């Protein structure tokens, strides 16, 4: 008998589900903990131009100001994340990490002097990526996804403008900017390869 190595392989759809559901569960778990009496994890968010607030770049996307804040982010995040995963799960992680780090760093540098938390910076990054990538790459798939995003979420454009004092428009603006940057870069790179 030949010695065959078996490898565990996750079907692509299952890995998309795992990726998106994993982030949703992490955010929900942290909100449950944050809701317990005497616990305030939001202090781990981004506090602009403070050395201790710099670490918030890594924590802010997973923390939320309350259940309404979390829920308002989860549905559009799940849809936009699923659309990015149509390219690949690896592509999703590249966009997620880039928008979280670059958008978060820009919030730390230029944001108002209060704590910034929430998945919406990354959500806007996914949105910016999907639109820019579709425009720049110009494949049928990329354009179709961009059209869906514009149809479903064209109203997000207003979130990059200061409207309410308790909403971090900076996270929205810099997340979208980071998404546009990575969308432009990856579209140009992918066009050279194809």
Where are these regions (language model features)?
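A detector for small-residue-rich transmembrane helices and their helix-helix packing motifs
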Residues: 2-194
């Amino acid at each position: 008998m030949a010695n065959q190595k078996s490898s565990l392989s996750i079907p692509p759809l299952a890995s998309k589900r795992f990726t998106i559901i994993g982030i949703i569960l992490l955010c929900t778990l942290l909100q449950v903990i944050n809701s317990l009496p005497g616990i305030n994890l939001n202090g781990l968010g981004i506090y602009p131009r403070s050395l201790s607030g710099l670490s918030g770049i890594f924590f802010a996307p997973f923390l939320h100001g309350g259940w309404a804040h979390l829920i308002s982010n989860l549905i559009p995040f799940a849809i936009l994340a699923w659309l990015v995963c149509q390219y690949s799960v690896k592509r999703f992680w590249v966009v997620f990490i880039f928008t979280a780090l670059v958008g978060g760093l820009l919030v730390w540098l230029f944001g108002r002097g209060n704590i910034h938390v929430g998945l919406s910076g990354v959500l806007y990054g996914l949105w910016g990526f999907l639109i820019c990538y579709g425009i720049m790459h110009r494949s049928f798939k990329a354009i179709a996804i961009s059209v869906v995003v514009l149809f479903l979420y064209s109203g997000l454009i207003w979130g990059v403008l200061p409207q309410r004092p308790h909403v971090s428009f900076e996270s929205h603006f810099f997340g979208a900017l980071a998404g546009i940057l990575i969308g432009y870069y990856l579209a140009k790179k992918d066009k050279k390869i194809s």
